[in-house]
């Protein structure tokens, strides 16, 4: 496994690396891990997150927001064949290891743990691990798809209306492009597939998609906090 240990990049370094990055054939792709020590707590962003989702304390899923910048830092150095714009986030799982205090500094380790070709495109798996005082606190595992332009779904489009289905709806939220831009500024995720229907179509999608993590944060925020009190995995 290729191992990198670095400081957090500046915005100018990110831009430079993004402009000069070259995609590599999948044969050269290898598991890669990036460790960034002493990541300072961002109290302004912490507060903005709580205000956006109406939380009294940060949700476990905030670990994704904290690690997102370093996921980008890893992707810009990993030898992968994919463009970074247009990657589709499929799933995210959070595992509690020990107590994490988001108001304190931490170390972040991000790893490209796996990759494979599929009928839909290239699937990547990533794991983000947070540490405080040398102790592992939270793990976040994510699946990401680089969708093949040649892939066509075999599933017939549903003609039903989800509102007619038998769901126990506890909350609803209208989601707009303004919502997507607001979350992009909060999280740093400016993937074009979320921000306008034209940029989404240019990347092979029929329309813009709200960030999947926005849906997760908002859904968790609607739950009774006692349901998250003794959580082990989400």
Protein language model regions, located:
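Generic hydrophobic/packing signal
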Residues: 69, 100-104, 110, 135-140, ...
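An exposed, glycine/acidic-rich loop-and-rim segment of catalytic or binding clefts
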Residues: 116, 123-181, 185
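Acyl-thioester-processing domains in fatty-acid/polyketide/NRPS systems
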Residues: 2, 57, 140, 230-234
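Soluble, non-transmembrane catalytic domains of enzymes that act on hydrophobic metabolites at membranes
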Residues: 27-55, 96-98, 103, 122, ...
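Hydrophobic beta-sheet segments that form the core/acyl-binding groove
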Residues: 87-134, 227-234
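Hot-dog-fold acyl-thioester-processing enzymes
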Residues: 1-89, 155, 159-226
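Unusually extended, aromatic-enriched hydrophobic runs near protein termini
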Residues: 73, 79-83, 101-102, 147-150, ...
């Amino acid at each position: 496994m290729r191992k990198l240990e670095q400081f957090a990049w500046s915005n100018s370094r990110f831009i430079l690396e993004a402009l000069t990055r070259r995609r590599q054939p999948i044969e050269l792709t290898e598991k890669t891990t990036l460790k960034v020590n002493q990541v300072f707590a961002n109290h302004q962003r912490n507060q903005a997150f709580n205000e956006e989702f109406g939380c009294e304390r940060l949700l476990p899923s905030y670990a994704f927001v904290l690690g997102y910048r370093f996921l980008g830092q890893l992707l810009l150095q990993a030898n992968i064949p994919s463009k970074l714009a247009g990657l589709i986030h499929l799933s995210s799982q959070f595992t509690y290891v020990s107590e994490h205090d988001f108001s304190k500094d931490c170390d972040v380790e991000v790893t490209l743990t796996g990759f494979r070709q599929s009928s839909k495109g290239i699937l990547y798996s990533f794991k983000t691990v947070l540490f405080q005082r040398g102790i592992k606190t939270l793990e976040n595992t994510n699946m990401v798809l680089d969708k093949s332009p040649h892939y066509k779904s075999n599933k017939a489009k549903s003609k039903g209306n989800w509102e007619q289905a038998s769901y126990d709806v506890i909350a609803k939220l209208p989601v707009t492009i303004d919502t997507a831009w607001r979350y992009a500024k909060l999280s740093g995720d400016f993937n074009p597939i979320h921000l306008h229907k034209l940029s989404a179509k240019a990347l092979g999608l029929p329309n813009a998609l709200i960030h999947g993590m926005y849906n997760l944060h908002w859904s968790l925020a609607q739950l009774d906090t006692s349901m998250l009190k003794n959580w082990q995995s989400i």
